[in-house]
Structure formats: structure tokens, C-alpha cells
From Swiss-Prot:
Cell division keyword on record: yes
GO process annotations (BP): cell division; regulation of division septum assembly
Family: Belongs to the MinE family.
Pfam family of the protein (one): MinE
Protein name: Cell division topological specificity factor
Organism in which the protein naturally occurs: Buchnera aphidicola subsp. Baizongia pistaciae (strain Bp)
Superkingdom of source: Bacteria
Keywords carried by this UniProt record: Cell cycle, Cell division
Amino acid sequence: MALLDFFLSRKKNTANIAKERLQIIVAERRRMDTEPQYLPKLKKEIFQVICKYIKINPEKIKIQLDQTNKNISILELNVTLSE
């Protein structure tokens, strides 16, 4: 009986993992659908300005727009600088 429980409990864990991954994908797509049209150009221009003054790997720059509600948007910029 314990052997059967072992195999059945694994399926539940796999299903939960798949569900969590799907929720992440759906949330990311929703976020991308609500991005303003100007955001990709803004990201590119911010990146160009940073690269003008600092030699940096493009993967070290993260730009994200968060909306807390309909009236407030937060532009978050994270730059990891090497020493």
C-alpha cells in the first residue's frame, strides 16, 4: 500500500508544479498585454544612455513596468554594476 501511495502522491506534486508554472506564464502574458506601446522604445533608449556612460552587459539591465492600480504605474530599473 505504501508503494501505491508513493506513486500516487508524485502525480499530485507534478500536477501542482505544472499548475504553478502555468500560472506564472499566464501572469507574464497578462503583464505583457498591458504594457504601453511606448515601453519597448523607452527600454531601448534607457539602455543606450546607460551604455553611453558605462560599459555593461545588456543582461545586467532589467527594466520593468508595474501597475499598482489604474492610476499608478511604477517603472523599475535595476542595473548590476561590476566592480
